[in-house]
Amino acid sequence: VSSGLNNRVDVSHYRLAVHLLIAFFILSLTFWDYLKLKNIDLSHRKLKFYLPLVFLILVFCQITVGAFVSGMDAGTIYNSWPLMGSSYFPDDNEFINIFTLTAFRDPSLVQFFHRNLAYVIFIYYLILVYKIYRNNLIRYFFPIKIIGLILFIQIILGIFTLLYGAQIYLASMHQITSIFLVSSSLYFLYLNSNSK
């Protein structure tokens, strides 16, 4: 039986990302409907509507870039942290290349994006924590701590996955944890919504 493969047995990282995102969108819609069925009280003081949404969008962007890393085996290069080799930017590239259309076909640049988007997400998380505690939004104290715990685990797993050359057990745990990060971020977004 012809398999349809033509000397290439790996999957396009773009197709892998689309496949993964569809799965996460299905998970998100299902979990959102589940939250609606729980009749959670939403009559509390809220953050500005876009703040949790931006966090969730950043997480989805990171999942997309993570799929690129996985599909290109970009986790098997530059197995050091916090530097990529001997510098912050990958040694085998030029900074100008991040602005080109081919940037997402370059494993070292994809890894660079994945690392730095993690830093952006962490900083944005700290901004959310500051806003929640500054405004004494008690209803958000527990959810934001849960997100923080999952985010911390995800970052540690990401670093160890990198340092150990993307061993399958570490990479799998890193990917599984993203499910919990998306779910907790969705719950946070739901708490801040006016959903009926």
What residue spans do the PLM features occupy?
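Polytopic transmembrane helical bundles with strong interfacial aromatic enrichment
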Residues: 1-196
